[in-house]
A protein has these predicted regions:
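Asp-box/BNR beta-propeller blade signature and adjacent active/binding-site loops
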Residues: 1-189
């Protein structure tokens, strides 16, 4: 549970990973939109976060959800968008893929850039020094409604590469539901 003063529609779309420390980490998307129809109590200017909770007792109990952060304690911002944990079979490292934005993100937007970062195996925070840009919006050719979210991940068992599949919805200014599909190959070695 999370207060509607922190996330106006609760939390949803969890991504879960078990760390090498045996800690279970769950990261959810939150929502910072004010809506009369939903009778929200959240305040204007509430920053957008991914929400973080963990269990050190095998999932019997979980901590109170808090804004997720880098391992140095710095909080980052993220819109209401799907994210994914992924553990590489090749190097055993845990990664997170998702959108990291500035504090101005509101609701679902913007859903760019798409980034990845390694997850600290002890506590479950992101290692800022591993932040890697996967894709970003081209302001010359792509709409501000671009969505670099709703992607799929798999690992090529022969090469060990991570393959990310993404349809760039909203890329075309004249048709927000039109989007081209892309495959990104990420070497993690």
């Amino acid at each position: 549970m999370i207060s509607d003063l922190k996330s106006s529609r609760g939390v949803d779309e969890p991504t879960i990973i078990v760390l090498k420390s045996r800690r279970i980490v769950v990261v959810f998307r939150g929502f910072n939109v004010i809506s009369k129809n939903w009778n929200t109590r959240i305040r204007m200017g509430t920053p957008p976060h991914k929400w973080f909770t963990f269990s050190d007792d095998g999932g019997r109990t979980f901590s109170e959800p808090v804004p997720w952060r880098y391992e140095n304690g710095e909080v980052f911002y993220s819109p209401a968008s799907i994210s994914r944990f992924f553990r590489s079979v090749v190097n055993g490292k845990a990664y997170w893929f998702g959108n990291i934005t500035g504090p101005e993100a509101y609701g679902y937007s913007p859903r760019y850039p798409l980034v990845m970062a390694e997850v600290d195996e002890e506590k479950g925070f992101l290692k800022k020094e591993t932040y890697t840009l996967v894709e970003d919006r081209d302001p010359e050719t792509e709409s501000e409604e671009l969505q670099l979210s709703n992607f799929s991940l798999l690992e090529d068992r022969e090469t060990g590469s991570i393959e990310l599949y993404l349809t760039k919805l909203g890329a075309y200014r004249e048709d927000r539901w039109r989007g081209d599909a892309y495959r990104y190959t990420i070497e993690v070695g």
